[in-house]
């Protein structure tokens, strides 16, 4: 499929909108009430530090809603204002935050049902309004909705669209796209749908397996078994790993994406030599600025003297998970929660350790003076962070 031609056609349709409806002022008060926080503003103005009795809170200097998320949420609110009585669907969570998605449900925005990773679009009719979330939708979903006569409201983050352009360049030049991402993540599913030949690698370890195979170290059957669900149809590692371009899911850990890019550059240099390198390797910077800022702020925060750290964001949020990884790498007691309600009045916290199930820890706040670092993922509103801080204040004020 010529995805570039399809996008051009879609973008010229009267039933497609990616710029909003000019109703920002009409929804501003709703957004402020639901998501903003005067307390967080005050803490920012005070050098990102709050002292309350024995509790000291240190905020990361970049956290919470990024501009892509703000744009997507605002467009969703504008859509309901513009279509007050029409049926409005969304193909997935608008962002990975439970409170934001619940607000949309309260506005009678309907979520496409999915079972086993397969979405059921049979309920979507001609004339319905369909919102594409911040991390995008597959080109096949867009095509289906367009052919069905839906009004498509595209809130895809421009940084995600940039990655789509990158893999389309790979496809046009007959390069295989190596996508650093999570195979089942909505953004990676969308990105791979715009690619030609592709292979998804989760981390540096998987990238090393690919690099080893390129250099003749590895078994074909074992390779295909490992990556069977992470590659394009009819993928042939002996043919399709000769010309590579690197792209990434925008919320992955920046340092790892960069290292993966360097690994494949070294690998292709070793195999083909410096004169032929550009014929076999392409590299584009598709790391999101907001993701990078939050990760750098987290690295600065974990250098502070902290007793523990609370990371706030959806449990299915990739960028939040990577913030948690940074805390773990420094050996800091850290707790990933998705809502303030995870903190109990009895000084317990229900949190999700990395790669594990939910766990309840008792007496998580120590006695005496305590310094708590706080950060949040790009899909977490300031209002949620405020409520977490208020919970901590209540627990340390008794």
From Swiss-Prot:
Residues binding (2E)-4-hydroxy-3-methylbut-2-enyl diphosphate, per UniProt: 96, 185, 250, 317-319, 379
EC primary class: oxidoreductase
Binding locations of dimethylallyl diphosphate: 96, 185, 317-319, 379
EC numbers, comma separated: 1.17.7.4
Binding residue positions for [4Fe-4S] cluster: 66, 157, 288
Keywords: 4Fe-4S, Iron, Iron-sulfur, Isoprene biosynthesis, Metal-binding, Oxidoreductase
Names of the cofactor(s): [4Fe-4S] cluster
Gene3D superfamilies in the record: 3.40.50.11270, 4-hydroxy-3-methylbut-2-enyl diphosphate reductase, catalytic domain
Cofactor binding comment, as recorded: Binds 1 [4Fe-4S] cluster per subunit.
Positions with a binding annotation for isopentenyl diphosphate: 96, 185, 317-319, 379
Catalytic activity: isopentenyl diphosphate + 2 oxidized [2Fe-2S]-[ferredoxin] + H2O = (2E)-4-hydroxy-3-methylbut-2-enyl diphosphate + 2 reduced [2Fe-2S]-[ferredoxin] + 2 H(+); dimethylallyl diphosphate + 2 oxidized [2Fe-2S]-[ferredoxin] + H2O = (2E)-4-hydroxy-3-methylbut-2-enyl diphosphate + 2 reduced [2Fe-2S]-[ferredoxin] + 2 H(+)
One Pfam assignment: LYTB
NCBIfam families: ispH_lytB (TIGR00216), PRK13371.1 (NF009911)
UniProt record similarity statement: Belongs to the IspH family.
Protein name: 4-hydroxy-3-methylbut-2-enyl diphosphate reductase
């Amino acid at each position: 499929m010529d995805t570039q031609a399809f996008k051009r056609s879609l973008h010229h349709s009267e039933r497609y909108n990616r710029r909003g409806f000019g109703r920002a002022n009409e929804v501003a008060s709703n957004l402020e009430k639901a998501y903003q926080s005067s307390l967080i503003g005050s803490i920012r103005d005070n050098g990102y530090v709050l002292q309350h009795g024995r509790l000291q809170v240190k905020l990361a200097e970049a956290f919470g809603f990024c501009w892509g998320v703000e744009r997507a949420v605002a467009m969703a609110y504008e859509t309901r204002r513009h279509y007050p009585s029409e049926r409005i669907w969304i193909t997935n969570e608008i962002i990975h935050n439970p409170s934001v998605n619940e607000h949309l449900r309260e506005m009678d925005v309907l979520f496409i049902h999915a079972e086993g990773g397969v979405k059921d679009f049979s309920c979507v009719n001609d004339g319905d309004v369909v919102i594409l979330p911040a991390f995008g939708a597959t080109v096949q979903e867009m095509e289906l909705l367009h052919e069905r006569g839906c009004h498509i409201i595209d809130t895809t983050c421009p940084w995600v669209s940039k990655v789509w352009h990158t893999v389309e360049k790979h496809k046009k030049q007959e390069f295989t796209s190596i996508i650093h991402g999570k195979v089942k993540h909505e953004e990676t599913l969308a990105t791979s749908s715009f690619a030609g030949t592709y292979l998804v690698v989760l981390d540096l370890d998987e990238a090393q397996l690919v690099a080893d195979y390129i250099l003749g170290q590895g078994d074909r059957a074992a390779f295909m078994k490992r990556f069977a669900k992470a590659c394009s149809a009819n993928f042939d590692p002996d043919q399709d790993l000769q010309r590579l371009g690197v792209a990434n899911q925008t919320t992955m850990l920046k340092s790892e994406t960069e290292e993966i890019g360097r690994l494949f550059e070294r690998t292709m240099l070793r195999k083909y030599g410096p004169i032929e390198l550009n014929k076999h390797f392409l590299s584009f910077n598709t790391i999101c600025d907001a993701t990078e800022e939050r990760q750098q702020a987290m690295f600065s925060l974990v250098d502070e003297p902290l007793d523990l750290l609370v990371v706030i964001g959806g449990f299915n949020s990739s960028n939040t998970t990577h913030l948690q990884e940074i805390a773990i790498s420094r050996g800091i007691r850290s707790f990933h929660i998705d809502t303030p309600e995870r903190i109990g009045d009895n000084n317990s916290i229900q949190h999700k350790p990395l790669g594990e199930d939910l766990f309840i820890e008792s007496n998580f706040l120590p006695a005496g003076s305590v310094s708590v670092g706080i950060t949040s993922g790009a899909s977490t509103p300031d209002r949620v962070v405020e409520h977490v801080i208020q919970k901590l204040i209540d627990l340390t004020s008794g």
